[in-house]
């Protein structure tokens, strides 16, 4: 059974995540004090029910040691996972402006901007421990719920899930990435007028990139690097490894390379997901 701990900055989507987890069959509790986590897990253990609990700045323990101690007290039948949701500063400010809600730290006579920054510092111990970090800046409510369903229901228990995602540097680097590889030096299909409207999923673009030795060398060396360190990552008690591949616009080269890497590791029995940020925005 899973004990999913959901945390993140206010306005990043924790309530949406809890609702999505509840739809997936999790027993959900909002803002449960950390010291009560073992008691909740023990209560649910006999019922064979996975649980999801949100922790935010209002019920953060005074020290990281309190959280670590609570994790050691969980029943053996529960596997804890920490999901951390985040969004960029401007997005959080806009969301608060749209909803006109008060930030939890506004009671300390802080401005909204200062409250967001202080909250980030207070939550850093949880963020650094997270199994999965999701940047919701560009996501709708439905997209976040769908991503959680895909990543959680598509994951085999106790196995590292490799996530290969393409992106465009002009849109910013994904904050949930564990590794970032820059492929802007590879031959660019954008300069071929026939290929420009296509993507790295289309056969003509694939054929174009397949013709270049440097493309194959990059893919070979990148997968060799990942294969070298994958055994250590798998034994490091992590649930996800997110590898981000970036080109200028996130449409051609990064998409192709991400798919090639995903196919390679999938063929070797790894649990793999692929995602293309720029292409998803165009839908």
From Swiss-Prot:
Sorted UniProt keywords: ATP-binding, GTP-binding, Nucleotide-binding, RNA-binding
Superkingdom as given in the UniProt entry: Bacteria
Q: Where is this region: RNA-binding?
A: 266-283
What positions does the entry give for GTP binding?
Answer: 56-59
Where on this chain does ATP bind? 8-15
Q: Name one GO molecular function term.
A: RNA binding
Matches recorded under InterPro entries: P-loop_NTPase, RapZ-like, RapZ-like_N, RapZ_C
| Matches recorded under NCBIfam families | PRK05416.1
PANTHER family given in the database record: RNASE ADAPTER PROTEIN RAPZ
**What HAMAP family does the record point to?**
RapZ_like
Tell me the protein family, please.
Answer: Belongs to the RapZ-like family. RapZ subfamily.
User: What is known about what this protein does?
Assistant: Modulates the synthesis of GlmS, by affecting the processing and stability of the regulatory small RNA GlmZ. When glucosamine-6-phosphate (GlcN6P) concentrations are high in the cell, RapZ binds GlmZ and targets it to cleavage by RNase E. Consequently, GlmZ is inactivated and unable to activate GlmS synthesis. Under low GlcN6P concentrations, RapZ is sequestered and inactivated by an other regulatory small RNA, GlmY, preventing GlmZ degradation and leading to synthesis of GlmS.
Indicate the quaternary assembly. Homotrimer.
- Identification of the protein by name: RNase adapter protein RapZ
Species per Swiss-Prot/TrEMBL record? Yersinia enterocolitica serotype O:8 / biotype 1B (strain NCTC 13174 / 8081)
């Amino acid at each position: 059974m899973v004990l999913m701990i959901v945390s993140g900055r206010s306005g990043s989507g924790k309530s949406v995540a809890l609702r999505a987890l509840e739809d997936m069959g999790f027993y959900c509790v909002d803002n449960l004090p950390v010291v009560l986590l073992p008691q909740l897990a023990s209560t649910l253990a006999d019922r064979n029910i996975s649980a999801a609990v949100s922790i935010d700045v209002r019920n953060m323990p005074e020290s990281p040691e309190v959280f670590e101690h609570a994790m050691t007290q969980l029943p053996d039948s529960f596997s804890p996972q920490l999901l951390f949701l985040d969004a960029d500063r401007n997005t959080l400010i806009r969301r608060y402006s749209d909803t006109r809600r008060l930030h939890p730290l506004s009671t300390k006579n802080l401005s909204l901007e200062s409250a967001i920054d202080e909250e980030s510092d207070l939550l850093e111990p949880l963020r650094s421990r997270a199994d999965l970090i999701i940047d919701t800046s560009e996501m709708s409510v439905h997209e976040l719920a769908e991503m959680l369903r895909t990543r959680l229901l598509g994951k085999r228990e106790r196995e590292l899930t490799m996530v290969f995602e393409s992106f465009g540097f002009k849109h910013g680097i994904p904050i949930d990435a564990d590794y970032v590889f820059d492929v802007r030096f590879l031959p660019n299909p954008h300069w071929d007028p026939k290929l420009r409207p296509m993507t790295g999923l289309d056969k003509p673009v694939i054929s174009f990139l397949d013709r270049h030795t440097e493309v194959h060398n990059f893919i070979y060396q990148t997968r060799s690097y990942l294969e070298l360190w994958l055994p250590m990552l798998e034994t490091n008690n992590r649930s996800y490894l997110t590898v981000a591949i970036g080109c200028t616009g996130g449409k051609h080269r990064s998409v192709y390379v991400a798919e090639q890497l995903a196919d390679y590791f999938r063929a070797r029995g790894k649990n793999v997901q692929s995602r293309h940020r720029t292409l998803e925005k165009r839908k």
